[in-house]
């Protein structure tokens, strides 16, 4: 009923109902809220999938869906949200892989998709996120190597990749991410799977 009420206000710019006891699903008609800038639904009990129609919300700056019971894949249409600065999908039941279209989010500062069942490789297109400050993908089933393209994320301050199935070596480009500051937090699994002998790899 709350969703039905919200959909009656097409000029709405902010929806913040985080940390409640909301249940139900995200309906495709949410794409009708074309003026929406903030959609904050975290820490509820929402279920179902993330509809692709969310990509129609071209004004969206903040999308918070963390700590719900969402499942399925991250829709590729999220890559159409060119004004998005924060994307928090953490602690759901999302699976499949990270879509390469995430690399289209040129203004993104936070990407948190931690603690669920995402698989596959980290897409090299994440290296396009030059404004990214925080990247948290810990606690998934991601595999493959850590892409060297992450070295292009020149604003990055924190990167958490531990508790995955990543392998290989972290390249020197990671330690060169900041010109004026050190990379504050780089967390990986430093035993057997990932070789991290770099000075900036301060935590395992």
Predicted regions and their residues:
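The feature encodes a structural signal of leucine-rich repeats
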Residues: 1-4, 26-28, 47-52, 71-76, ...
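Leucine-rich repeat
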Residues: 1-38, 49, 55-60, 79-84, ...
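Conserved hydrophobic beta-strand positions in leucine-rich repeat
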Residues: 15-17, 36-41, 60-65, 84-89, ...
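Eukaryotic tandem repeat interaction scaffolds
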Residues: 64, 82-145
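Leucine-rich solenoid repeat scaffolds
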Residues: 154-204
């Amino acid at each position: 009923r709350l969703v039905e009420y919200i959909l009656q206000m097409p000029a709405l710019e902010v929806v913040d109902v985080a940390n409640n006891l909301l249940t139900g699903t995200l309906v495709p008609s949410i794409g009708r809220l074309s003026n929406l800038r903030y959609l904050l639904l975290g820490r509820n009990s929402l279920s179902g999938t993330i509809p692709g129609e969310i990509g129609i919300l071209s004004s969206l700056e903040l999308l918070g869906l963390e700590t719900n019971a969402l499942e399925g894949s991250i829709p590729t249409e999220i890559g159409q949200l060119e004004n998005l600065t924060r994307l928090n999908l953490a602690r759901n039941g999302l699976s499949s892989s990270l879509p390469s279209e995430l690399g289209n989010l040129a203004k993104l500062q936070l990407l948190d998709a931690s603690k669920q069942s995402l698989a596959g490789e980290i897409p090299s297109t994440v290296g396009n996120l030059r404004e990214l400050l925080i990247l948290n993908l810990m606690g998934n089933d991601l595999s493959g190597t850590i892409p060297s393209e992450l070295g292009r994320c020149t604003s990055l301050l924190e990167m958490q990749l531990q508790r995955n199935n990543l392998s290989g070596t972290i390249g020197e480009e990671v330690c060169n991410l900041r010109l004026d500051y050190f990379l504050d937090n780089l967390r990986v699994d430093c035993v057997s799977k990932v070789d991290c002998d770099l000075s900036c790899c301060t935590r395992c």
